[in-house]
Amino acid sequence: PLGRDYVKKQPFADQSKAALERLVLGKVVRLSYGGRRVDRHGRALAHLHLKDGTWVQGWLLEQGLARVYSFRDNRTRVAAMLALEEDARRRKEGLWGHRYYSILDAARSHKLVDTFQLVRARIKDAVRIKGRVYLNFGADWRKDFTVTISPKNLRLFGKAGLRPETWQGHEILVRGWINWRNGPMIDVTHPEQIEVL
């Protein structure tokens, strides 16, 4: 998955790959870029379009064959992709019918460190310390799930008119890689990773 040998294959990966191959293999595709063209692993960051106008990423999301994974410096069409993903999730289409892809409760996030997840939880405490925002979801920030936003990334939130440090008590859906730093944590790099519910 993700073109990296050390990442464990996720459930439904083979079905998604087979569907993508049926859709595009042997066909001419047009690439459209919307920011950085290559990621740090050397993969092209492009939207694919078939001759008939089919937007490949949109089709995959609509069929429940993919999740939205966006980048700070390449956010083109992310809003449209999130809407398609949400619709497929609501219908339990494709991978959304698999337990592995269920939206995670913050209390269980420690079990899925080093995986990309969607986590839904209510913010217990929202603070800004030395320019960094911490959204805490439990009584002990040293061991409970936390979302962080660096000063650099916080500027994107400001440009979008968002102030995450004021979200205490709000329920959110956050997406990203869970890492371990004083408990399970997601470092958010851009506003599209968080939806205030």
Language model features by range: what are they?
Residues 46, 86-87:
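Alpha-helix boundary/capping detector
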Residues 1-69, 141-158, 173:
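Electropositive
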Residues 41, 90, 94-197:
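OB-fold single-stranded nucleic acid-binding module
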Residues 63, 87, 91:
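Mid-sequence acidic-hydrophobic segments that form the walls
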Residues 82-84:
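Compact, glycine/acidic-enriched structural inserts
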